[in-house]
Amino acid sequence: MTISTYPLFESHDDFVDQDFTVCRSSIRSVNDYLESFDEELLAIDGYLAARTYLRHYAENPLTFSTYRCQVERLLLWSLNILKKPITQLKRLDAEAFLEFCKNPPASWVGPIIRNRFLDNKDSTTTLAHPVVINSKWRPFTQKTPKQFRGDLVNSDDQVSQGYHSSKGSMGNVFKICSGFYEYLIEEDLAGTNPFRKVNKKNQYNATPDEGAVTRALTPLQWDYVLETAEAMAAAEPNKHERTLFILITMFSMYLRISDIAGRSNWKPTMGDFRRDQEGNWWFHVIGKGNKSAKIAVRDDYVTGYLTRYRRFLGLSPLPEYQEKTPLITTLSGRSGLSDRQVRALLQAVFDNALNRMRTEDREAYEMDSLRAASSHWLRHTSATFDAPFRNAKDLQSDLRHSNLATTQNTYYHSHDQERAHSVKRLGLRDRG
């Protein structure tokens, strides 16, 4: 049986220019393709997760193309071959995918690299579909001698004879796909990294991910993000007081998306803020693995933002005992938001902050990492800022890390800027 495999992601320039607050592809035919899969495969959710991951590597067109190639293949394979949501893969699935990449079927291999999308020449549909999927595109390309490539441009031939992935190529597959699942775990979208458990990792020549960015904002970037959210709230309070509250709540308490959007068995309420006998505030959550925990709440958050949002909602300044008011609601007042909706709201803040930095002529190096920021960066950023001032054990408890070493290895080191400045002006002579 021939399985239709279509490109899911744009060229580099079109990819970076799209509106990432929209939870759909910028190309309608891609949306139609994703919607053609059974609902339980969560094709659109998988696509959005992959899109955000790829955004981390969009600064360099060549790096982006490399990462897009591997993640796109994995998503297409999980939907078409495995028929399983990409967020639910296990070790055996990862091993099966790696074997698949060594010798893909003929229908997945093309003789030359082709354009992913083409201008729609059909005047009756061009308004709705300005570009369409190139049906000749394939996820894999067989290396063809240069002198024969011209003859293949208009060919429909699919080539798999002699297709072999090199050890270096398989190392890229392993490294990039493993990095993708580490990202999914951070974003609370997957429970495990199936590639981390693969047997005989050394055969894939896996190397550290040198293209990864530090997933924390700089102090300057955070100032812009917070100021932008406050400006959005001032300009459109009915729409963005909630956005500001979500942003500052996640940042203040190192929260994951699920801590604020909720889980199937738990939805956060204002009553989850509780004050102890000494007047300290705690936020009670049901986290990963259905583990209950409490997180210390800083005074600045309570007096500056929690009370502000509650007054905006017409509530008493502070949460009451066993209060059932949902922590966040839709604009119409319905309880709760989906994690996808929360991500979109935060993405709008990041994008607007980046636009402000551009408008104010900030240097490129000051903005670069903000282009890749996602909701989980708030947790990392806050912990990075707070680590120099907090006991490691206390920070571990509020981050809900099971292992103290994880907290120490991740946050108890200098910020890159501080590290650079600590050596920048040290001379090489007269050090006595």
Annotate each PLM feature:
Residues 287-307, 323-350, 372-374:
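C-terminal catalytic core of Y-nucleophile DNA break-rejoin enzymes
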Residues 164-167, 224-257:
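Basic, Lys/Arg- and aromatic-enriched nucleic-acid-binding interface segment
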Residues 262-308, 314:
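Conserved tyrosine-mediated DNA breakage-rejoining catalytic core shared by Y-recombinases
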Residues 178-182, 241-261, 283, 385:
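Short pre-functional
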